[in-house]
């Protein structure tokens, strides 16, 4: 029996199936052919839901196509099932669970991002409740990251969430390396400097944003060549700069800043869309220096918004050669080589040569570290490495060139 199935406006396919098979089997076959998830899809006939326990033969008398009512059917019209698959299989790190973090995580979850890791040290306070959609009065005193992760997953169960309640500097490096994009929703310069260092050194795209009252800014940073978010700051004023803050509650020794839900929503929406652009196009960009036409390229300049005076402008900021992060003497002036290695290769002969080839290193290896979800462990010889590593872990390798320069490489075990 041949059955026509359709995602309206996107694609229509014909499926041949034994009439004795169940409607549920039809759904599985159709979803597999279209590259969408069966558990997020319903089958409709003339607008009414089909029972999946019925036989396919029940459709013989109908000439209308069976509609696949997929959760993200409207998004397929723009980027197709392959584009949606990229979102469903990606991890995004959200640094900061305040006002921006609430809105960005909501948007990413609604778009179908598969996993969101949320990091924040702070607790929910009363002034947060009026501006942050996932915080309620009963959450007062609880950790922001944990509350946001729990409530996002509760509302959008198809999104995996996890929380890290601690300082960014203490977070295992693996959690950064696992992230396709880092979204910055931080309220202090010191943490933003650290985050930018990590993103530049390990070439992780960073979408940074800030708000002050009815003004805001958004910057997309594609390392290593872009102007980094810290290039704006004069080197001799780092200790005094607060800049455009993300409106989490101010520390006791800092003045509170004005915050409005309208500017929060606007800036966060732009930040989320920039994240989607990077997820869809970063591989193509790194290979061809072109961004996909369907989703567009991220901001190449810093976007400034002024809702009070209705002003919106992009400003090009040149790289600062004296930048504390990416400058000639910056803390992240050198970037690490990144590669992948099948885990089985470590159990073959000459693992040292195998690792060198994977890391594109031909110098003397000084130290090898294991980076996993528990943190960093120094490895003493290859027998130790073989016993300790798991698929998905990383090896961080430091090597020394003949001229004395140190090189760093990151190898993911797949």
For each feature predicted by the language model, list its residue ranges.
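Eukaryote-biased recognition of intrinsically disordered, low-complexity regulatory segments
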Residues: 1-16
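A cross-taxa feature marking solvent-exposed loop/turn segments within ectodomains of secreted
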Residues: 10, 36-38, 61, 404
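Short, solvent-exposed loop/turn motifs
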Residues: 11-12, 49, 403-408
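Short loop-to-beta-strand transition segments
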Residues: 19, 28-49
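Adenine nucleotide-associated cytosolic modules
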Residues: 21-22, 28, 33-34, 66-414
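Eukaryotic mixed-charge, acidic/polar low-complexity intrinsically disordered regions
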Residues: 47-69, 385-388
């Amino acid at each position: 029996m041949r059955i026509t199935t359709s995602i309206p406006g996107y694609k229509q396919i014909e499926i041949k199936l034994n009439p004795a098979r169940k409607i549920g089997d039809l759904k599985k076959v159709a979803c597999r052919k279209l590259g969408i998830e069966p558990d997020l899809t319903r089958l409709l006939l003339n607008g009414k839901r089909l029972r999946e326990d019925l036989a396919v033969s029940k459709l013989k008398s109908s000439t209308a196509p069976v509609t696949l009512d997929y959760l993200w059917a409207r998004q397929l019209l723009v980027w197709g099932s392959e584009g949606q698959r990229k979102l469903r299989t990606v991890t995004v790190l959200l640094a900061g669970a305040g006002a921006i973090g609430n809105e960005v995580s909501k948007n990413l979850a609604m778009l179908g991002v598969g996993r969101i890791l949320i990091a924040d040290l702070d607790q929910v306070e009363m002034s947060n409740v009026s501006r942050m959609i996932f915080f309620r009065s009963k959450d007062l005193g609880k950790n922001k990251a944990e509350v946001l992760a729990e409530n996002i997953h509760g509302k959008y169960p198809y999104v995996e969430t996890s929380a890290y309640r601690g300082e960014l500097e203490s977070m295992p490096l693996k959690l950064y390396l696992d992230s396709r994009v880092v979204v910055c929703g931080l309220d202090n310069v010191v943490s933003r400097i650290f985050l930018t260092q990590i993103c530049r050194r390990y070439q992780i795209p960073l979408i940074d944003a800030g708000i002050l009252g009815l003004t805001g800014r958004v910057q997309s940073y594609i390392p290593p060549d872009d102007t980094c978010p810290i290039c704006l700051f004069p080197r001799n004023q780092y200790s005094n700069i607060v800049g455009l803050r993300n409106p989490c509650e101010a520390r006791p020794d800092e003045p509170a800043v004005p915050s409005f839900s309208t500017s929060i929503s606007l800036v966060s929406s732009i930040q989320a869309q920039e994240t989607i652009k990077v997820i869809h196009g970063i591989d193509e960009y790194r290979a061809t220096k072109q961004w996909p036409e369907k989703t567009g390229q991220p901001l190449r300049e810093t976007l400034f918004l002024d809702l009070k005076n209705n002003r919106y402008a992009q400003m090009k900021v040149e790289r600062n050669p004296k930048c504390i992060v990416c400058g000639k003497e910056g803390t992240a002036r050198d970037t690490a080589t990144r590669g992948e290695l099948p885990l089985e290769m470590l159990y073959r002969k000459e693992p040292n040569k195998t690792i060198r080839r994977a890391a594109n290193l031909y110098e003397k290896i000084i130290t090898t570290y294991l980076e996993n979800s528990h943190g960093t462990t120094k490895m003493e010889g290859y027998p130790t490495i073989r016993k300790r590593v798991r698929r998905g872990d990383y090896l961080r390798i430091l090597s020394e060139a003949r001229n004395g320069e140190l090189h760093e490489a990151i190898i993911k075990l797949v």
